[in-house]
Each structure stands twice: as structure tokens, then as C-alpha cells.
Regions:
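Conserved catalytic motifs of ABC-family nucleotide-binding domains
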Residues: 160
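Conserved ABC ATPase "signature" region
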Residues: 116-134, 243
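The feature captures the beta-strand-to-loop junction immediately N-terminal to the Walker
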Residues: 41-43
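C-terminal boundary and immediately downstream tail of ABC-type ATPase nucleotide-binding domains
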Residues: 129, 216-218, 224, 228-248
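Conserved ABC transporter NBD signature motif
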Residues: 64-75, 79
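Helix-to-loop junction immediately C-terminal to a conserved catalytic motif
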Residues: 56
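Conserved ABC ATPase signature
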Residues: 139-143, 147
Length: 248
């Protein structure tokens, strides 16, 4: 379904007039299957968030292609309504002048639905993410971090996408809230039969929600492994990264 084909990305290194470039992603190839949760695990600076931006078409690769059902995600029509994203910084993800209802409805503006249909959908989505209907007219400054992220998840789900990219989506939340959001994501995945790309540095969270893990290091894939076979990882780096979770 979502296929990354020999993708690379560089950024300019040094001053304005420097011609030197830094390799951030190098020859990345993998697939996220329909209905699965694929974890992309790596330390800060490994390039995993850059990869996330390529998956949703925010940035373009220097070479290679990101395909969704065989079509390039650089074409907005390919990803519109079919690929959504939830990012780490939930506070800047929603326009502070929007009510919760306006924020959730933002991706639906092109769908020619009636006001009644849209309002009914907002109520349904709020219920699914564990927020009361009364939150429709609230603004984000009135909500807790966990509540704002639930609104972001409701917005991402609103178009009933086939795939959601979750880039450190729980890392800014209190530990007590993280598990609640993970359980919510699991439930929504079943309801809508979606795929997730779960980008994180949190090994335990990834092991809880993912079907497969892709270990990322220095802009390259170190190893891909099924979660039930984590003990069988071959890479020395992968074993080191998983030490907090598994005794080898």
C-alpha cells in the first residue's frame, strides 16, 4: 500500500553560501502493508522524522519515490483524504483561533457534506476519542495536552484515511496519558481498518502497538523485525536499542 522506493534526502550544511550537503536519509526502501502498524524506531537525529515528512508529502526526496497504491504522494490528490498525520507538537498543529469542531472539520472542507452531516460526524469522532460533545465549542487553550492530542487524532481520522503517520505522537504527553492514547489508537485502527506508521524513540510504546519495527540509524534502515521476534534481531545496534525492553 505505502511503498518507499530507494529514497534519499539531503539538507544544506553550513552557511548560506555553502555548497556542502548532509545526508539525512540514504537509500531507504520498505513497505507498510494494508492494516498493519509499522514502527520506525530510532534515536534523535537518526532521520526518522524527516522520513515522516516525506511520507505525507510535506517534503520531497532528493531521489527515489514514496508511493501510495502505486502513485507518487507528491501529487496532493493521491494523499488527500487517504493519508493523515499526527505530530508531536500538538499545540502548533491546530489553529488557536479554531474551535475543536472547526479543527476536526478542517480536512473535510473539500467533501461537500451538509452542515448537519459534518456536525454529526464531529460528535461521533469526539465520542470515539473519549471527549464529550460539549467540547465542540472549546478552544485549544482550554484543553489539556492529552485532550488536544485526542482532537488531533479525531481530525486525522475524520476523512477515514487508509494510513496515518504518527510522528512522536505521544512523546509530549504525561506518562499517565500515553497509555490511554495508545489504547485509543489501537481501537481506532480496528474501527477504521487503517494502517499506521508509528515513528518514535520509545521502544516500549512501539512494542505495545506495532506489528513490525524498523530500526533506524544514521538515516539508514538497520533492521526490520516482527514484534513477536524481537529477540531474534541480528544487528548489534538493534540489540543495544532493545536492551531496555528485552534481556538477550
Amino acid at each position: 500500500m505505502l511503498k518507499v522506493d530507494n529514497v534519499g534526502k539531503t539538507y544544506k550544511k553550513g552557511g548560506l553560501f555553502s555548497s556542502e550537503r548532509q545526508n539525512v536519509l540514504k537509500n531507504i526502501s520498505f513497505e507498510c502493508k494494508s492494516g498493519e502498524c509499522l514502527g520506525i524506531i530510532g534515536e534523535s537525529g537518526s532521520g526518522k522524522s524527516t522520513l515522516g515528512r516525506l511520507l505525507v508529502g510535506i517534503e520531497k526526496p532528493d531521489y527515489g519515490r514514496v508511493l501510495f497504491d502505486g502513485k507518487n504522494v507528491e501529487d496532493r490528490k493521491v494523499r488527500q483524504g487517504r493519508i493523515s498525520a499526527v505530530f508531536q507538537d500538538y499545540k502548533s498543529s491546530i489553529n488557536p483561533f479554531y474551535t475543536v469542531e472547526e479543527a476536526i472539520l478542517e480536512p473535510l472542507k473539500l467533501q461537500n457534506k451538509s452542515n448537519t452531516e459534518n456536525k454529526d460526524k464531529v460528535v461521533k469522532l469526539l465520542n470515539q476519542v473519549g471527549l464529550p460533545e460539549s467540547y465542540r465549542n472549546k478552544y485549544t487553550h482550554e484543553l489539556s495536552g492529552g485532550e488536544i492530542q485526542r482532537v488531533c487524532i479525531a481530525r486525522a481520522v475524520s476523512t477515514e484515511p487508509e494510513c496515518i503517520v504518527l510522528d512522536e505522537a505521544i512523546s509530549s504527553l504525561d506518562v499517565s496519558v500515553q497509555m490511554q492514547v495508545l489504547d485509543l489508537l489501537k481501537d481506532l485502527k480496528k474501527i477504521y481498518n487503517m494502517s499506521y506508521v508509528f515513528i518514535t524513540h520509545d521502544i516500549q510504546a512501539a512494542a505495545y502497538i506495532c506489528d513490525r519495527m524498523m530500526i533506524f540509524k544514521d538515516g539508514q534502515i538497520e533492521e526490520i523485525v516482527n514484534v513477536e521476534h524481537l529477540r531474534d534481531v541480528q544487528s548489534v545496534y538493534a540489540r543495544k536499542l532493545l536492551q531496555s525492553l528485552i534481556t538477550f
